[in-house]
Amino acid sequence: MNIRIGTRGSILAIAQTLEIKNLLNRYFPEISVQIVKIKTSGDINNQVPLSAIGGKSLFIKEIEEALLMGKVDLAVHSVKDIPAFYCEGLIIPCVLKRNSPYDVFISSKHKDIKSLPLNATIGTSSVRRKVQLNYLRPDLQVVPVRGNIDTRILKANVGEFDGIVLAEAGLIRINRCDVIKEILSPKIMLSAVGQGAIGIQCRVDDHSIINKIKVLNCHQSYVCVMAERSFLKTINGSCDTPLAALAQYVNNDTIHMSCMLANEKNMVFASCCFNECDAEKSGINMGKKLMDELSQYY
């Protein structure tokens, strides 16, 4: 049997896909695993803000098309890049054990965000990060930055920005933790939905593949990601919606989740604890609660 894995060709995407390939080889040594690099619209249009050209779905569109056409058997995605609703006929039955869900601050000049001078320039194209940075430091000038991780690190190192904010998990996966100056607490920078998690997507009727990749699934990571994605779906959030959610187990079956939703003028937060069997329902309830609270500011 041969399994073809569809993935983007970036350094980070290949690192994530190799992790899946190695796991499949470990569990199923008799199977041949092939990596198929697919260039996505998000990779091609890497100088334009995502919100201006179609959002996060641009990072998975061509890969999902390859899946549906049978050109690949499964796809590997950063869960935070998966939009609220993806192609009919596909399923994500597996989430690997989650890496760090936190954001980090990188700078060639400053040790942390607190030490940045007045009106310092921070690079990030994430509206989620922008609203939280401006809530923390209204003086900061937050400007867009696109490109792969190495490109963004280089821009920080040559002084194009006073600092940038990136996901810690990506830096861990490409062995670039040396550039981290500060790991940002979720109290000041709440994570993107699914941040730090790798999801495996396949065709909903491909039961042979589904049964195989389920052995790679981390139950707790999957449940937390589904709770966060229920929040995302309820809001129908996209890459230009300032929202955040982080669900984490506090014991064997109890989860704590914090969520944020914002508009141009206001930001609202909420948190709750729930049993894992209520994960998706709790995500829906949190979404409704924050939408209702935010609507009261208009």
Swiss-Prot record:
What's the record's note on cofactor binding?
A: Binds 1 dipyrromethane group covalently.
Q: Which domain of life is it from?
A: Bacteria
Q: In which pathway does it act?
A: Porphyrin-containing compound metabolism; protoporphyrin-IX biosynthesis; coproporphyrinogen-III from 5-aminolevulinate: step 2/4
UniProt xrefs under SUPFAM superfamilies: Periplasmic binding protein-like II (SSF53850), Porphobilinogen deaminase (hydroxymethylbilane synthase), C-terminal domain (SSF54782)
What Enzyme Commission number(s) apply to this enzyme? 2.5.1.61
GO CC term (a single one): cytoplasm
The reaction(s) annotated as catalysed by this protein in its Swiss-Prot or TrEMBL entry are:
4 porphobilinogen + H2O = hydroxymethylbilane + 4 NH4(+)
Q: Which GO terms describe its biological process?
A: protoporphyrinogen IX biosynthetic process
Q: Which UniProt keywords apply?
A: Porphyrin biosynthesis, Transferase
Q: Where are the membrane-spanning stretches?
A: none
Required co-factor?
dipyrromethane
Q: Which Gene3D superfamilies match?
A: Periplasmic binding protein-like II, Porphobilinogen deaminase, C-terminal domain
Regions annotated as coiled coil = none
- State one molecular function term (GO): hydroxymethylbilane synthase activity
* InterPro entries, per the entry: HemC, Porphobilin_deaminase_cofac_BS, Porphobilin_deaminase_N, Porphobilinogen_deaminase_C, Porphobilinogen_deaminase_C_sf
Residues modified as S-(dipyrrolylmethanemethyl)cysteine are C239
Record-linked PANTHER family: PORPHOBILINOGEN DEAMINASE (PTHR11557:SF0)
Family the UniProt entry places it in: Belongs to the HMBS family.
What job does this protein perform?
Tetrapolymerization of the monopyrrole PBG into the hydroxymethylbilane pre-uroporphyrinogen in several discrete steps.
* Any further remark recorded for this protein: The porphobilinogen subunits are added to the dipyrromethane group.
The subunit field of the Swiss-Prot or TrEMBL record says: Monomer.
Q: What is this protein called?
A: Porphobilinogen deaminase
Q: Which organism is it from?
A: Ehrlichia chaffeensis (strain ATCC CRL-10679 / Arkansas)
Organism phylogeny: Bacteria, Pseudomonadati, Pseudomonadota, Alphaproteobacteria, Rickettsiales
